[in-house]
Amino acid sequence: MSAKAISEQTGKELLYKFICTTSAIQNRFKYARVTPDTDWARLLQDHPWLLSQNLVVKPDQLIKRRGKLGLVGVNLTLDGVKSWLKPRLGQEATVGKATGFLKNFLIEPFVPHSQAEEFYVCIYATREGDYVLFHHEGGVDVGDVDAKAQKLLVGVDEKLNPEDIKKHLLVHAPEDKKEILASFISGLFNFYEDLYFTYLEINPLVVTKDGVYVLDLAAKVDATADYICKVKWGDIEFPPPFGREAYPEEAYIADLDAKSGASLKLTLLNPKGRIWTMVAGGGASVVYSDTICDLGGVNELANYGEYSGAPSEQQTYDYAKTILSLMTREKHPDGKILIIGGSIANFTNVAATFKGIVRAIRDYQGPLKEHEVTIFVRRGGPNYQEGLRVMGEVGKTTGIPIHVFGTETHMTAIVGMALGHRPIPNQPPTAAHTANFLLNASGSTSTPAPSRTASFSESRADEVAPAKKAKPAMPQDSVPSPRSLQGKSTTLFSRHTKAIVWGMQTRAVQGMLDFDYVCSRDEPSVAAMVYPFTGDHKQKFYWGHKEILIPVFKNMADAMRKHPEVDVLINFASLRSAYDSTMETMNYAQIRTIAIIAEGIPEALTRKLIKKADQKGVTIIGPATVGGIKPGCFKIGNTGGMLDNILASKLYRPGSVAYVSRSGGMSNELNNIISRTTDGVYEGVAIGGDRYPGSTFMDHVLRYQDTPGVKMIVVLGEIGGTEEYKICRGIKEGRLTKPIVCWCIGTCATMFSSEVQFGHAGACANQASETAVAKNQALKEAGVFVPRSFDELGEIIQSVYEDLVANGVIVPAQEVPPPTVPMDYSWARELGLIRKPASFMTSICDERGQELIYAGMPITEVFKEEMGIGGVLGLLWFQKRLPKYSCQFIEMCLMVTADHGPAVSGAHNTIICARAGKDLVSSLTSGLLTIGDRFGGALDAAAKMFSKAFDSGIIPMEFVNKMKKEGKLIMGIGHRVKSINNPDMRVQILKDYVRQHFPATPLLDYALEVEKITTSKKPNLILNVDGLIGVAFVDMLRNCGSFTREEADEYIDIGALNGIFVLGRSMGFIGHYLDQKRLKQGLYRHPWDDISYVLPEHMSM
């Protein structure tokens, strides 16, 4: 959500810190918080003023009218405060319909004052600007401030100066206090703006001869502005409404939501409830809650929540297991119901999200069966058949009753089934995959009926008509938006519309091109892309079977200059970049329509976008939207989902019904409903779920009224805001004459005892007129076709449509089959429709899932088991979990081979390169390239040579004699410096460890016998570190129990031992590189006196 209430303590803390005014604000930071856990001694130590002043005490839990409810203790001593708190602190209280525990109180100094010194101040945000309310009589009995207070609208980007305050607001204020009040209100407004408040009320504001006192304060801030205000806000805590506890599970899901690009919401209404929901989509989640409440389940509804925006399988698993753990804590005598619902997704891979839910169901199958949970599933969208299949299968394998339905079933029908209001049908067979668009259109299961009921000639004529201006016939009491133009285009999109896409959204662009192709457009609708984080280049896409290139520009100016035909920009920028990029876009006169996909743009910034768009005559769709679609012409981004849904919902050609919705998921649901009950969609727009969408319901309804091809209009309204009343006024004034079907979702809100913020930021009623129930009633009285519930929406649409057909308003026309579009390889592979041999194979590592896996072991387990470098090397090199002593031995080998000074060839090369100014990788590589038979390769050779001698059965003396006879050196024997009298401590350490920990050391024993023979001839012919590592490694592989003899021999043959030296010595080489850089050594040139110049004599003469 966007606007969130904060506690009075938080509001005052921010006010005292950041308000800038010449008025003397008294009692700054004088407040103390008391909870059931408060240590009074510590509290008095932190706030010594509690002992010296009379006090006021009140609960700080978002309770309105505390004074009227007797919840304020006034003019008390500290003992009086304690006595007052005793029967209240931690006790249950009822406020209106809500019952909750009083557990957070605020103590402040008592301010003696008269009634004449009490004032009322309030600032709140609207679409047009911020209203400032002032009343000269504040306090408990202030009454209806909307009717009594002086009111001043401060427009977007306008400033409030003290003179305007005195002139418009302080009309009835005492003369001697006007200057102080004007300064304070001016500072308060600047503070409100700077810290992104959406609501700020002080009642009473007391002004005495000593200064200004802020007694009671209520406030909301725009939570989406956190990235702007974090430094000033700090870590704000958003308390739940009174009557609803704050649960750790809600905090856990909120934390998941904050870390994810997807949306994850959870509100617990009644943890003991019988009906639980897990719904995909902000709009759909409201519709399901409405339907449950309409069917009498309000007291049994346990939670409200939603997941959307393509969460990963792991995120969905975490969300699902949280809900399943909550619902399996307390039994219900009638068992429990879990509704896994959702509209038809636009871009979320349903199979991926359902696999996360299925994992959670498997993990909780025992408790689910114990609590007699029945699950009802309904979903549509990309790959939904696979999702429904895995959901059905888990029901069969676990024995949990799971009823699964797809798009053939009305979205909310499963609620009626779950609550026993309608029978559970035998499930119709569903397709095995989402590949209908592979088939010839005439034989496809998604092909519409052979006749339709709209005139193609009429629609086509309208598409190429010049843009018209909307008539400015708005209700008189609405605030007009300043516009430099007379109006905005009636026609936003045509078959020739060209767009620029901001953001590297290749999947969305490909979806748009496939839609263009299936609509038989002559050219792709995407002319270019803009992405500031890469240089100019071209991106490859498919146009039917052909490959085409679309330019990608770093700068928007270049894209606009090279594509003057573009008049639409689709903005996929993140919430942090969307405002700036949209503002930049509006500097180009060619752009007439902008779609802003991002969710989470602060409302104050959105209002600035709206103001500039109105001045420029630009239509904004969004923010927080999937976009819109005009069948046969153009679609924005991911709207309408994949091609199979485009075909199933007949979105490849225009129908006669236009719709406008807030929700992206519900707009796709409307596509489905309208295609099943009428001849199809003419145009559909999702204006977005924010409180201030760039364009409103009325903007689009007026366009549809003025568009000849549109015969009827469908509006899916929502709780929050008053836009739907403009439709009522439009009908009464005769501006709207076409039949309109409308339903406002969110009717359940009036049935809840405490306020619930739904999935959309704007879905919250701030007054009675903003409730869905009030709006539906007003629409019905105005003559709009309003169903009794969302369940009946399709029936009403069909009834109105059939009347239009019967009256000849819509004339039947022949269906035209769309062209066949091939499926993307990656999607076909995911659906299991195709296979091909892989170019590469790997058996050691898998990075594709939620966490990295080494040879079958998740990375979390690697750390949990403290496997260390040796354990990881065992997994990656040998695909084995080696014994602890083996892991330690490998690490010891890496330690002793890490370096052997700067004089050896590898280190020398590394140093030379480093001093030549080369980078780390180049220097390291030059050192590694010296490793071979003469340097470092002795590990492999020694292991092979000693193994062969040992396995052949010859005794050590025979082996030494044989090598001498053949004139070969024994690899691993001999050292330039070390000898039997000056032993190599590296060898000694390893030898002692191996003998102490290895179960058997036959090859090491053999090598030591060889050493006795060789050192008897020459003391430096010892078993060196290469030789010891080589023979000990063979002993480890053969005798640790993890390998067969064949596997052990194979690892020696393929050079595993050489890897030990390469890996170990790399550490040393890197050390030498860093050392040279740190010492700032210059280019090395070898001295002449260290080089023997041996030239041919006849040349030197």
UniProtKB/Swiss-Prot annotation:
Record's comment on post-translational modification: Phosphorylated by PKA and GSK3 in a sequential manner; phosphorylation results in activation of its activity. Phosphorylation on Thr-447 and Ser-451 depends on the phosphorylation state of Ser-455. Phosphorylation on Ser-455 is decreased by prior phosphorylation on the other 2 residues. Phosphorylated at Ser-455 by BCKDK and dephosphorylated by protein phosphatase PPM1K. ISGylated.
Keywords annotated in UniProt: Acetylation, ATP-binding, Cytoplasm, Isopeptide bond, Lipid biosynthesis, Lipid metabolism, Magnesium, Metal-binding, Nucleotide-binding, Phosphoprotein, Transferase, Ubl conjugation
Residues of the active site: 760
Positions of modified residues (Phosphotyrosine): 131, 682
Obligatory cofactor(s): Mg(2+)
Main location: cytoplasm
PROSITE patterns linked: SUCCINYL_COA_LIG_1, SUCCINYL_COA_LIG_2, SUCCINYL_COA_LIG_3
Residues the record lists as Phosphoserine modifications: 263, 451, 455, 459, 481, 663, 839, 1100
GO molecular function, one term: metal ion binding
Bias (Polar residues): 478-487
Self-association state and partner proteins as the record states: Homotetramer.
Protein name: ATP-citrate synthase
Species this protein is from: Homo sapiens (Human)
